Amino acid sequence: MDIISVALKRHSTKAFDASKKLTAEEAEKIKTLLQYSPSSTNSQPWHFIVASTEEGKARVAKSAAGTYVFNERKMLDASHVVVFCAKTAMDDAWLERVVDQEEADGRFNTPEAKAANHKGRTYFADMHRVDLKDDDQWMAKQVYLNVGNFLLGVGAMGLDAVPIEGFDAAILDEEFGLKEKGFTSLVVVPVGHHSVEDFNATLPKSRLPLSTIVTEC
């Protein structure tokens, strides 16, 4: 299946078949999608909670109580539920961790190359955390890059998913102690196979025309 076919076929799943689970291979592949998403300067300012047990999904679904109860069944019935979390502040230790991993993965031929890479990434990090003072927003944008990459990727795997912002982040952050770890939850994405109750699966896709959204020059 080519990438355009995937983009045209995938949809936001409104109901999941609780009896259909991801295979062990598929479960590993969705984690690989999370790991290899692009991010600005390869900063990777994220963490993910992958819930696949009934207990784990129930913990995530606590955030769908009250106002967001309409999203509860999606979280409980999906095979897996991924919580996308962003760092709340960029720190030097994280930048060092990234460049050290790049070195371990063989991306630098010389110490000077490593130093130059680290200097460049730190420049952009400082632009946001020192000058613009919007590093939390900058890092959230990187997580959304991951969400988009993930949705297209699981679609290419023949799986169904839905991005959810309708949840109580404060409840979810507390449930998993995210604030203490320097993260906050941004998006919840249930993954699995849609059920016959998924009305959105049979509706035609609707998008604004290219003439409205694209300027060519």
Swiss-Prot record:
TM spans (from-to): none
Q: What is its EC number?
A: 1.-.-.-
Might you name a Gene Ontology BP term for this protein? 2,4,6-trinitrotoluene catabolic process
A GO cellular-component term linked to this record: cytosol
The GO molecular function terms of this record are: oxidoreductase activity, acting on other nitrogenous compounds as donors, with NAD or NADP as acceptor
Pfam families the record matches: Nitroreductase
Residue numbers binding FMN: R10, H11, S12, T13, K14, N71, E165, G166, K205, S206, R207
Which of this chain's residues are annotated to bind NAD(+)? K14, T41, T67, N71, K74, R107
Q: Which coenzyme or cofactor does it need?
A: FMN
Give me the disulphide-bonded residues.
Answer: none
For this UniProt record, give its keywords in alphabetical order, as a comma-separated list. Flavoprotein, FMN, NAD, NADP, Oxidoreductase
What enzyme class is recorded for this protein? Answer: oxidoreductase
Q: Which NCBIfam families match?
A: PRK11053.1
Instruction: Spell out the subunit comment.
Output: Homodimer.
Its annotated function is as follows: Reduction of a variety of nitroaromatic compounds using NADH (and to lesser extent NADPH) as source of reducing equivalents; two electrons are transferred.
What's the family?
A: Belongs to the nitroreductase family.
Note in the entry: The nitroreductase might be involved in the quinone metabolism.
State what protein this is by name. Oxygen-insensitive NAD(P)H nitroreductase
- Gene name tied to this protein: nfsB
